[in-house]
């Protein structure tokens, strides 16, 4: 599975966009784009979703198998 940062970098380059141009479109700073692409952890899901929205994507919550709990 590809990381969010790797996805953003790949899509940005495929669209021949600079980090600055993507930041302007998404309403975030260029350093935020740089940090996101490098995989720096963030709790700013609102900002991550604004970046992903430029490419028609978003972060969401999906059901996952629950780990078995042994008392």
Q: Model features per residue range: what roles?
A:
Residues 27-41:
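Recognition helix of helix-turn-helix/homeodomain-like DNA-binding domains
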Residues 6-21, 25:
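Short basic helix-loop element that most often maps to the first helix and adjoining turn
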Residues 1-3:
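A detector for short, charged/polar N-terminal pre-domain segments
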Residues 38, 63-64:
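Short, conserved catalytic or interaction motifs in soluble domains
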Residues 66-71:
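Helix-turn-helix/homeodomain-like alpha-helical modules used for DNA recognition
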Residues 46-61:
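DNA major-groove recognition helix of helix-turn-helix/homeodomain DNA-binding modules
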């Amino acid at each position: 599975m590809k990381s969010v940062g790797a996805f953003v970098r790949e899509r940005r380059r495929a669209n021949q966009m600079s980090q600055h141009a993507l930041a302007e479109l998404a309403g975030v700073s260029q350093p935020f784009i740089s940090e996101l692409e490098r995989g720096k952890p963030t709790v700013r899901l609102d900002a991550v979703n604004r970046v992903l929205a430029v490419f028609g994507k978003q972060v969401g919550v999906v059901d996952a198998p629950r780990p078995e709990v042994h008392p």
